[in-house]
Amino acid sequence: MGGGSAAADPGGDRAARVSAAMGTATIRDITFTAQNPSFGGPLVEGYGAHMADRNRRFLLRQRPTGRIGPDTFELNEEAIPELADGEALARVDWISLDPTNRMWINDTPSYLPPVGIGEVMRAGGLGEIVASKTPRFTVGQKVQGLLGWQEYAVLSDTAMVNPVDVAEGISPSAYLGALGMTGLTAWIGIRDIGKPQPGETVVVSAAAGAVGSVAGQLAKADGARVVGIAGGPEKCALLTEQLGFDAAVDHRADDWAAQLAAATPNGIDVDFENVGGDLMDAIFARLNIGARVALCGLISGYNAADPPPGPRAFGNLLIQRATLRGFIVLDHFGRAPEAMTEIAGLIEAGKLTPLETVVEGFEQLPTAINMLFDGKNVGKLVVKVG
């Protein structure tokens, strides 16, 4: 999805430098795999080996009320169908887990239709073309886009999937993170909406997550003073010690509101909003005149059984003449080459450190997605299928 950019082919030496930066950025002690007992939930066992001509996929069984549970999805296996003219078959190697996945299984209006009962769970992914009857895709080509929770995806000529040039020495998972839609999301929010100026104060909620960690580092590269909000002392230390944030607020601490006030003595000029709820109210109350709010997500309400209440401090946007703008990354694919070129350059220069959490095993998908809402991941959460 726009990952096939100038940054995707940075050249041998540059690729090695980018790869080295990303490798040291992976948080090994917070990388959850199927073999790691610290993984945030019970592992799924007993599926066994499967035929190469079969396709395992997770279908939506029922819409959850609140948290995703064991009855939300069902594992289904089918024969890989024969391709028709104009189709290609992709082997899915990596699957992206994102808060928006939770929104897509609600039966409510959104920017994409909800996943239907009995349909393959929608998700971004990265894979390789293994068969093709269309000139759009060639065998051996890497592709990125909406591949879904399945091991093989049949792609039509109109599929929301694009080729991506994976540079030698760089993990393909990077193209689902900082060098993919995650990076583009952060870049649009900072460059087009937040527009931080040197010396301004930028607050990023869910700052240790996939988008927030990149957004904060982009703002820091612009010369802003960056305050990150994260859950727990370990994540807060990560923000200040590894990512270069100027201050961090632990939203799990009893005194988080006092921490926010202390970290923003001159008010807040830019809010990169990923969470909503009480955190957003506290941020809105500290906005400066002319502040900009980039509304990227509202993860605090995605598992809510009932609609969450609206912001209580909304009136301060009026008083401070602030601007609030929501945005969806799907509207900005055309900006991907520009964004990826800049982000790759910042990684190479040591000014941006990508983070990722890797879960190994296709069967872990229904459990792994809850890591997003339990605060068990750092940076981009991806599942390695094979």
List PLM regions with ranges:
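Residue-level detector of structural "landmarks"
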Residues: 6-9, 14-21, 30
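C-terminal hydrophobic helical "lid"/dimerization subdomain
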Residues: 48, 52-53, 330-386
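Glycine-rich beta-strand-centered segment in the early N-terminal region that forms part
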Residues: 80-97, 105-149
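NAD(P)H dinucleotide-binding glycine-rich loop of Rossmann-like/cofactor-binding domains
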Residues: 121-128, 138-206, 351
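Short, glycine/polar-rich helix-capping loops at beta-to-alpha or helix-loop-helix junctions
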Residues: 150-151, 231-239, 309-314
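Mid-domain Rossmann-like dinucleotide-binding core that forms the NAD(H)/NADP(H) cofactor-binding site
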Residues: 176-254
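Glycine-rich phosphate-binding loop and adjacent beta-alpha segment
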Residues: 278-352, 385-386
